[in-house]
């Protein structure tokens, strides 16, 4: 048996399955704005947009700075839901995966989070952040005071909690043995993560349908709605991870 060819075939099938999951969303939540461009072009355009916000922020009044922080939150949300996630979709999962390039090599769940954040412009060490536990990742990135901890609830309970208590935006979620992104569009709760279940690759799926979403604990922290984190992104401030 030709194992390299079999591995390639499995990865291709995995990618197709991941795209099939994406296709089931059937709305504009994850409309891919960069389908005719490569990853480097997408990152460069994100850098330019962030630079424009940074220039306005630097010259702005307190009120204008607050508007820039809001604009950065919108940019972060769109950079992921309509850009970064799609480039990484189908990248093979591995517990020790640390690839820096989408669809080339393997990526572990923590490295998927830290690497994509690094790529869109956060000043952080992707290795140190990924090597922390999910809760500690959220503490260093988002701030301990922003974390919502929910115990002994089902994935559907978490979705209902979002509907009742939280607003549209990009979030980070830590589970008992896993970490990834959540995106809440006001109605549906999506889980974007490097999946160790089936298929074992980066996927976009509804949270309650995920094979790995059953957990005794959910730790949720805001990203796009996190003013302090958006300030750090704009100011290129180092996110310290011991």
Q: Would you name each region that the model predicts?
A:
Residues 19, 128, 195:
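Residues at the C-termini of beta-strands that transition into short coil/loop
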Residues 25-130:
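N-terminal capping segments
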């Amino acid at each position: 048996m030709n194992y390299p060819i079999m591995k390639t075939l499995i990865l291709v099938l995995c990618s197709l399955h991941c795209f099939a999951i994406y296709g089931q969303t059937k709305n504009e939540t994850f409309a891919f704005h960069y389908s005719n461009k490569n990853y480097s072009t997408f990152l460069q355009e994100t850098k330019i947009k962030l630079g424009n916000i940074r220039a306005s922020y630097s010259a702005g009044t307190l009120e204008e700075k607050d508007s820039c922080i809001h604009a950065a939150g919108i940019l972060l949300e769109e950079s992921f839901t309509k850009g970064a996630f799609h480039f990484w979709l189908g990248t093979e999962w591995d517990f020790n995966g640390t690839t820096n390039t989408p669809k080339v090599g393997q990526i572990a769940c923590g490295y998927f989070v830290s690497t994509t954040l690094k790529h869109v412009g956060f000043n952080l060490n992707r290795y140190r952040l990924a090597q922390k536990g999910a809760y500690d990742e959220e503490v260093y990135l988002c701030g301990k005071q922003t974390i919502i901890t929910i115990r002994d609830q089902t994935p559907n309970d978490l979705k209902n909690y979002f509907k009742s208590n939280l607003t549209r935006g990009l979030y980070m979620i830590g589970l008992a043995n896993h970490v990834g992104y959540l995106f809440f569009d006001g109605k549906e709760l999506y889980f974007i993560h490097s999946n160790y279940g089936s298929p074992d690759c980066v996927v976009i799926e509804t949270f309650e349908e995920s094979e790995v979403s059953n957990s005794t604990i959910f730790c949720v922290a805001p990203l796009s709605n996190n003013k302090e984190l958006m300030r750090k992104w704009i100011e290129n401030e180092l996110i310290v991870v011991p």
